[in-house]
């Protein structure tokens, strides 16, 4: 036991003695503790004493337990018992039947196929079951290959079942679609495939919650990084993918509408034109990003990464959203070297990424050059890429752009490329010694115009009739290949019909996909390049009519919801509309005559007032009635005009007809304020003005 308050101090004669500073002990007793201090045991010392003394039973003289120790059971408590059998004690805590699991798997697949549904919480869901195949299905091996023919003495050697035929056509097709390349490839064609750039890409993918894939509207499928999209869907399924169709001002509006409709089945797609002063799609993209930030309300901010091919306009889109130059921009590829963080709003950050090029066996050196991956000035022989360019561009556009003479059938092959480059070099004055045309310099000029959009070109949307030479289809020169292509036309039609059916079926299952609250008037896009009549046409088909009907239905639904909420507001709005419809709107000519008559009456009244200035008598009743009527008419007209002027609805106008873009409208003289008269009309100048002052 510890020492209490009243223990014997005589047993310890040195108790209470304190050493002095010199080290000698004095006989005087001094108090160790300050008066008022608690000298009882604290909690720590009390628990230690309890640990030492506890754990033992209290017994009497005979050894019988009087008080049991802690955690000690008596004989009565230790009687044998029996637990009632129940599955809840011995079964699994989380179980699911196979039918429920199959239902979950099918529902999960349908939701995964829908790019417009977002899974907010996934911590307690068995997401691995969605990727597994159904284990109930047994492999039908015995039906395809019997056991006796596979194993045993009657086993047969397996050979591929091929149709017997000649391999000439197959070899020609292989040369067309997969041309042989030299083993030693120039390093300039490997731009965008280095480990450093792909390291920057994976930094952006890991850091971003929303990934925006920027596509070129002239060739969306050609500028899509398919391996990156598949990687995001398999490994990063929780990240959102959005397609942005940039450079829509370089293609007709019907092409943009088709591509948006086609790409919207796989991911939300937005048409965009990057320009700080005159952009298209900026509000729609910001609205979409705000919706994603609302979905991730548990996070302080979200990051949006921009990926895509070089020279597709990733940095230009960021500058457009910020409305100022925050990223370096150039019309040549490879300007962005490293990733860059930009703050768009308090909760939305943007990440700029350098352009990447996926390694694909189908892309040749010419394809990489025509996609704008390589800088043209660094090419050693740019003239070798011109024949492929001539196959993709209509001859009329080259004639119009460079002022060439018309040739029936256009130019094909190396001979046509030589003729075109020679004519362009002579016209532009690019000559070598002796007056020979510099074809390489002319080829660089044509390729630069091609990349910057001065030469009109676009790839026709899939599953639709192609527009002549604009479609990205390689035309053959030999007769054998032409015959082979004619045979394949029927197969291509069948595949197109199959694709159309798949697209329609997918559209029926998923519905017409569009993000609610994000609408784009694609018909109002101002195209910079002028296309010919058959290229600038716009198809009106059943599908587009269905889209318009769906838009009307969505608008009607929104109106119904608004009606339920604000009935009084709409009634007042209807009254305002009825008031706005005035006599001037219905009969403008008669209204003009009435206004003129009113003006004459007002002038007469003014003259009468000027004549009667000296006589300040009360005017007659007729004059009062006239003035009141005129004043009331003027008040009504001013009220109507005020309503029209204060409305926030602006009429659509073309930006390039009003603004002085590149000094095109510098000769046009428009006064700053036509309503006001000039200073010379109001005040006299010269000596007369000085005299009056």
Swiss-Prot record:
The keyword Nucleus applies. Residues 661-677 have a biased composition (Basic residues). Residues 480-500 have a biased composition (Basic and acidic residues). GO terms for cellular component: nucleolus. GO terms for molecular function: GTP binding. It comes from the Eukaryota. Transmembrane segments: none annotated. Residues 541-588, 597-618 have a biased composition (Acidic residues). Keywords: GTP-binding, Nucleotide-binding, Nucleus, Ribosome biogenesis. Coiled coil: none annotated. CDD domains: NGP_1. Residues 647-660 have a biased composition (Polar residues). Belongs to the TRAFAC class YlqF/YawG GTPase family. NOG2 subfamily. The C.neoformans mating-type locus is unique, spans >100 kb, and contains more than 20 genes. MAT-encoded products include homologs of regulators of sexual development in other fungi, pheromone and pheromone receptors, divergent components of a MAP kinase cascade, and other proteins with no obvious function in mating. This is Nucleolar GTP-binding protein 2. It comes from Cryptococcus neoformans var. grubii.
């Amino acid at each position: 036991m510890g020492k209490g308050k009243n223990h014997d101090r005589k047993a310890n004669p040195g108790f209470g003695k304190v050493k002095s500073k010199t080290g000698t002990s004095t006989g005087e007793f001094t108090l160790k503790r300050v008066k008022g201090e608690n000298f009882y045991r604290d909690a720590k010392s009390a628990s230690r004493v309890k640990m030492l003394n506890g754990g033992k039973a209290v017994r009497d003289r005979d050894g019988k337990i009087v008080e049991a120790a802690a955690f000690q059971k008596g004989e009565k408590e230790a009687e044998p018992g029996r637990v009632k059998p129940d599955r809840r004690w011995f079964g699994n805590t989380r179980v699911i039947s196979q039918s429920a699991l199959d239902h979950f798997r099918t529902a999960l697949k349908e939701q995964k196929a829908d790019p417009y549904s977002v899974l907010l919480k996934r911590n307690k869901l068995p997401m691995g079951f969605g990727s597994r195949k159904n284990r109930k299905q047994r492999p039908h091996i015995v039906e395809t290959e019997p056991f006796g023919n596979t194993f045993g003495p009657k086993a047969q050697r397996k050979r591929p079942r091929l149709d017997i035929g000649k391999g000439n056509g197959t070899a020609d097709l292989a040369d067309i679609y997969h041309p042989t390349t030299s083993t030693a490839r120039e390093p300039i064609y490997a731009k965008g495939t280095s480990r450093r750039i792909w390291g920057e890409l994976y930094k952006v993918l890991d850091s971003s919650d929303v990934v925006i894939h920027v596509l070129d509207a002239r060739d969306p499928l050609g500028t899509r990084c398919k391996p990156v999209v598949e990687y995001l869907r398999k490994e990063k399924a929780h990240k959102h993918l959005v397609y942005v169709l940039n450079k829509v001002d370089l293609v007709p509006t019907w092409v943009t509408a088709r591509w948006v409709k086609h790409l919207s089945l796989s991911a939300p797609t937005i048409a965009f034109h990057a320009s700080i002063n005159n952009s298209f799609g900026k509000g729609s993209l910001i609205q979409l990003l705000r919706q994603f930030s609302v979905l991730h309300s548990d996070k302080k901010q979200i990051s949006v990464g921009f990926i895509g091919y070089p020279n597709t306009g990733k940095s230009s889109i960021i500058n457009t959203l910020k409305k100022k130059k925050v990223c370096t921009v150039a019309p040549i590829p490879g300007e962005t070297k490293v990733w860059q963080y930009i703050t768009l709003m308090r909760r939305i950050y943007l990440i700029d990424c350098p352009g990447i090029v996926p390694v694909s066996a189908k892309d040749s050196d010419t394809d990489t050059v025509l996609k704008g991956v390589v800088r043209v000035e660094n090419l050693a022989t740019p003239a070798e890429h011109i024949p492929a360019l001539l196959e993709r561009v209509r001859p009329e556009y080259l004639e119009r752009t460079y002022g060439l003479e018309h040739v029936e059938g256009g130019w094909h092959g190396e001979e046509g490329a030589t003729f075109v480059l020679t004519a362009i070099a002579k016209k532009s004055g690019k000559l070598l010694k002796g007056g020979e045309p510099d074809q390489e310099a002319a080829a660089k000029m044509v390729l630069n115009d091609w990349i910057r959009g001065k030469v009109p070109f676009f790839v026709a949307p899939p599953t639709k009739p192609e527009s002549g030479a604009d479609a990205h289809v390689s035309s053959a020169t030999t007769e054998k290949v032409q015959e082979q292509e004619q045979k394949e036309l029927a197969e291509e039609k069948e595949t197109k019909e199959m694709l159309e059916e798949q697209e329609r079926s997918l559209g029926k299952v998923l519905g017409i996909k569009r993000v609610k609250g994000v609408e784009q008037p694609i018909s109002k896009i101002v195209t910079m390049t002028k296309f010919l009549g058959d290229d600038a046409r716009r198809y009106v088909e059943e599908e587009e009519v269905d889209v318009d009907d769906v838009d009307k239905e969505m608008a009607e639904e929104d109106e119904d919801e608004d009606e339920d909420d604000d009935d009084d507001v709409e009634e007042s709005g209807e009254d305002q509309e009825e008031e706005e419809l005035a006599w001037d709107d219905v009969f403008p000519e008669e209204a003009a005559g009435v206004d003129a008559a009113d003006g004459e009456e007002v002038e007469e009244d003014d003259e009468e007032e000027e004549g009667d200035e000296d006589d300040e008598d009360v005017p007659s009743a007729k004059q009062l009635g006239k003035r009141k009527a005129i004043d009331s008419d003027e008040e009504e007209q001013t009220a109507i005009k005020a309503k029209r002027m204060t409305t926030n609805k602006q009429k659509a106008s073309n930006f390039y007809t009003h603004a002085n873009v590149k000094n095109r409208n510098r000769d046009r003289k428009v006064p700053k304020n036509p309503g006001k008269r000039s200073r010379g009309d109001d005040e006299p100048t010269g000596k007369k003005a000085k005299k009056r002052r």
